[in-house]
Amino acid sequence: MRKNKLRQIVKDGGNIVNGWSAIPNSYAAEVYAHAGWDSVTIDLQHGPVDFQAALGMLQAISTTDAVPLCRVPWNDAAIIMKLLDAGSYGLICPMINTKEEAEQFVSFGRYPPLGTRSMGPNRAVQYAGADYWQGANEECLLFAMIETKAGLKNLDSILSVKGLDGVYVGPSDLSMAFGKPPTLDPSDGEVIAAIEEIAKVTRSKGLIAGVHTDGPATAKKRMGQGYNFLTLMNDARALSVYAANLVKETRGEAANVTAKTY
């Protein structure tokens, strides 16, 4: 089975630089994935990407060295299994608030004896190899999103679930959970403390700490806090920010448009 290079990056003490694809188009995904990302995550939770679009995007990303990942819309067996069968080499699941929810997610994403995933890989065999079923539990990554006070409270028990590779922080939802405006670079002390605590606890257990950011400056800050899986905004936001700054610069204005939210 094709190896998941993200595991080796982490093993070597490196940081995963992850792209985020929200435009439901295979050509856009292909161009974006050629930027040099370690991985590109297709987002099926927020935005217009459905399974059919995601399938073409997975194929497009596979023309590059980027590892194809997906964020599922919810902790649902059907879509979790379909995306893994389609060749996603990892999944990020939103709103995991309890150990039981994490166990359910892992069960859907792992073949027996670790889980209850049904046998039926289709495109995954073309991408990963005929022995996919033998190595999928070891190569495919599963991340639980921590973005609520409940998830934060239950972090230790969530991280104890066998078969879970790490967590992924949604700073905007986490900020809102603390009664603050949504932002990818929180300034509130409570939210910052929560972000730091999540990384500290996760890394102490030898697991991967992931987080969404608004760009390189915030990503580097999160690296300093212990995060080793870092997303830099998304393709739609990157396109709009870059285009807006091109227009401003051409007009002699300050090219200072930045990504404030997702």
Where are these regions (language model features)?
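Expand to "…catalyze enediolate/carbanion chemistry for C-C bond making/breaking, isomerization
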Residues: M1-Y262
